[in-house]
């Protein structure tokens, strides 16, 4: 594994914790890969990632979703993980059974790296970001290998099959 370092104000090398992100991209910068990169950077980490989907949305609704071919996502992830390595892998929007399955197979190659599984299912505007048939694939393939699962309350309702009371 290569070290990811920069020099601090005193010209000393600073080592970063490396987080590899596998998530969707959206134009607002308030969710997905863009938001994850900001969050990791704000915590002093080094973020790298592979885009799973390109989402066309505005503040009102999701207009279209384009999925990146699974093999391209896996290739990008392997290029980084085998060369640089990661201290953590975080997933975001995976959208389909094919993506969930492909990413699960990839993550199984890196059993020793902690995994944050964010089951992105519903946009902040309430639009579906995960095909219904992919919910079970998350439960069967990704959740068992997760170090932590981070659903929001809407996603928790989908996973539980019942309303969740937020107080």
Residue ranges of model-derived segments:
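Alpha-helix N-cap and loop-to-helix initiation/capping positions
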Residues: 64-72, 130-134, 164-166
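A short acidic, helix-capping loop that chelates divalent metal ions and anchors anionic groups
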Residues: 55-63, 123-128, 156-160
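Small-residue (G/A/S/T)-rich helix-start motifs and N-terminal tracts that mark the onset
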Residues: 7-88
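Glycine/small-residue-rich loop that forms an oxyanion/phosphate-binding "nest" at active or ligand-binding sites
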Residues: 81-141
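Short, small-residue-biased leader/transition segments that mark boundaries at the very start
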Residues: 1-6
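Conserved phosphate/ATP/ADP-binding segment of small-molecule kinases
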Residues: 132-167
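Non-cysteine beta-strand/loop elements that form the S-adenosyl-L-methionine
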Residues: 48, 52, 114-119, 142-154
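Fold-independent oxyanion-binding glycine-rich loops
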Residues: 22-25, 30-31, 51, 91-93, ...
């Amino acid at each position: 594994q290569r070290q990811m370092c920069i020099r601090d104000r005193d010209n000393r090398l600073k080592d970063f914790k490396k987080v590899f992100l596998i998530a969707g991209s959206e134009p607002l910068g308030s969710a997905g890969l863009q938001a994850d990169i900001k969050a990791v950077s704000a915590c002093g980490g080094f973020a790298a990632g592979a885009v799973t989907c390109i989402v066309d949305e505005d503040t009102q609704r999701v207009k279209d979703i384009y999925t990146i071919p699974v093999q391209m996502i896996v290739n990008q992830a392997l290029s980084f993980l085998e060369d640089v390595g990661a201290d953590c892998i975080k997933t975001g929007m995976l959208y389909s059974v094919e993506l969930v399955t492909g990413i699960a197979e990839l993550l199984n190659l890196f059993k020793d790296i902690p995994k944050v599984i964010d089951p992105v299912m519903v946009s902040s505007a309430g639009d579906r970001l995960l095909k219904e048939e992919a919910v079970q694939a998350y439960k069967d393939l990704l959740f068992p290998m997760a170090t932590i699962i981070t659903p929001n309350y809407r996603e928790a309702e989908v996973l539980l099959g019942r309303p969740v009371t937020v107080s």
